[in-house]
């Protein structure tokens, strides 16, 4: 087999069918490639624009036989205006301070992640994530990745977001937060914070991953409008917009 690291064109592979984590009774397949070679940053940029997501040093996208429910979506930053509910969430979290960190895992982050997973996703695919798994998720990257930490005035870590810095935007890879503060709506707030950060950096988009038609877990993404969806004709306005 050709060594991908010595070629300019990536080698793509496809997974065996696995139970779908979003739609009960469905099975998913993924096409993926390794972010290797001399230009992993430009490769990740191009693949993200083509609907791929990054997990460690792999870029993947759904390739299911009889289902197209997973749709890559991104927020159009310049046209986004927070409504009343979003403004309240922004005000509620005005005390939090954001610090961009290198992609380095810490015990403090992992402790917060465990509280989040145990409270919010105890039955999910990441429920058994170990400390070493977390280190791999954060640190196994060949591209420009940051881990944004959000802290209260007393220094307490309240939320964190693993984010890829792209040529045309920010891609939210994974985020987690303190589950004991539901009144803050921290998950929503981190998306809003990324939109404002992208605006300050003159970046046109915030990539939110996949909206899954029929999945309640992914329905929240349509609240951030205007939203674009990747279609067979390219990026177009999402129907919810």
From Swiss-Prot:
SUPFAM superfamilies: Acyl-CoA N-acyltransferases (Nat). Keywords: Acyltransferase, Cytoplasm, Transferase. It catalyses: N-terminal L-glutamyl-[protein] + L-leucyl-tRNA(Leu) = N-terminal L-leucyl-L-glutamyl-[protein] + tRNA(Leu) + H(+); N-terminal L-aspartyl-[protein] + L-leucyl-tRNA(Leu) = N-terminal L-leucyl-L-aspartyl-[protein] + tRNA(Leu) + H(+). It is found in: Cytoplasm. Its EC number is 2.3.2.29. InterPro entries: Acyl_CoA_acyltransferase (IPR016181), Asp_Glu_LeuTrfase (IPR017138), N-end_Aminoacyl_Trfase (IPR030700), N-end_Aminoacyl_Trfase_C (IPR007472), N-end_Aminoacyl_Trfase_N (IPR007471). GO terms for molecular function: arginyl-tRNA--protein transferase activity; leucyl-tRNA--protein transferase activity. One of its GO terms (cellular component) is cytoplasm. It holds the Pfam family ATE_C. GO terms for biological process: ubiquitin-dependent protein catabolic process via the N-end rule pathway. It is an enzyme of class 2 (transferase). Belongs to the R-transferase family. Bpt subfamily. HAMAP family: Bpt. Functions in the N-end rule pathway of protein degradation where it conjugates Leu from its aminoacyl-tRNA to the N-termini of proteins containing an N-terminal aspartate or glutamate. This is Aspartate/glutamate leucyltransferase. The gene is bpt.
